[in-house]
A protein has these predicted regions:
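Acyltransferase donor/substrate-recognition loop-hinge adjacent to the catalytic core
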Residues: 3-4, 150-207
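A short helix-loop-beta-strand connector motif used in the catalytic cores of GNAT acetyltransferases and
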Residues: 45-61
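Conserved beta-hairpin
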Residues: 56-72, 161, 167-170
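Short amphipathic alpha-helix that is part of the acyltransferase structural core
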Residues: 2-47, 196-207
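Acyl-donor binding region in acyl/amide transferases
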Residues: 82-164
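Trp/Phe/Arg-rich N-terminal binding region typifying the photolyase-homology
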Residues: 52, 60, 66-69, 76-82, ...
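A short glycine/small-residue-enriched secondary-structure motif
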Residues: 36-40, 72, 78-90
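Glycine-rich, histidine-containing beta strand-loop boundary motifs that form or position
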Residues: 72-76, 93, 123-128, 169-171
Length: 207
């Protein structure tokens, strides 16, 4: 078994590895829906993401030999910590192969950086602000996902909990009951929108 090495992303070459890793990890997973690469890059661009005016972050990659096997971002939102009187470091963009040690080393890297910055608490997965995606999928792995929802394999929460992390709250990403009767109000709104914008439904045939 190769030793797991954690490295901090400090250049464009490593940042590309960070962006590309999920495409390798989930290449055979039909449930995974990738984020737009442009959006991911913008999120970490201090010139384009206003949140980075009050957030510090570090990106870590886990290696097994020359191969990237995991990634994570540690974030300190100074504005949030000041408002809520907390000393929290956040973690997000946590992706890793199905090995406890990889996740452990990644989270330890975030924890250690947090301690060095005076933080006393860690929480995640989160983004830079509370307007970003938050949480980890714990049920519904068989359901289709979208770009707007979180997706992760079922081993993620299992491994994180084995590392003594505790769930704080349960959220429902989305729930649609297809057998419910559609209210008349929805039909009226639908017709108004179609008339106002001159819309029509076109059914295409597959090739």
């Amino acid at each position: 078994m190769n030793t797991i090495t954690i490295k901090t992303v400090i250049n464009k070459k490593d940042f590309k590895k960070f962006i590309d890793f999920p495409y390798t990890l989930f290449k055979d997973d039909k449930k995974w829906v990738p984020s737009l690469v442009m959006d991911e890059k913008t999120t970490f661009d201090k010139k384009k993401n206003p949140a980075l005016e009050f957030c510090d972050f570090k990106i870590f990659l886990a290696y097994k030999g020359p191969e990237v096997v995991g990634r994570v971002v540690g974030m300190i939102n100074h504005k949030s910590n000041e408002i809520w009187k907390e000393k929290r470091i956040r973690f997000g963009w946590l992706d890793f192969i199905n090995e406890d040690i990889v996740c452990q080393k990644l989270l330890e890297a975030v924890e250690n950086w947090g301690r060095s910055e005076g933080m006393t608490e860690i929480v995640g997965p989160m983004g830079f602000t509370d307007m970003d995606k938050e949480g980890m999928l714990v049920e519904g792995f068989e359901e289709d996902c979208t770009m707007a929802t979180y997706y992760n394999p079922s081993y993620y929460p299992q491994i994180v909990e084995r590392l003594s992390y505790k769930k704080e709250v349960d959220w429902i990403q989305y729930r649609i009951k297809a057998n419910q009767e559609i209210p008349e109000k929805i039909f009226r709104i639908n017709n108004l929108i179609k008339e106002k914008y001159n819309l029509r439904i076109v059914e295409g045939l597959s090739a």
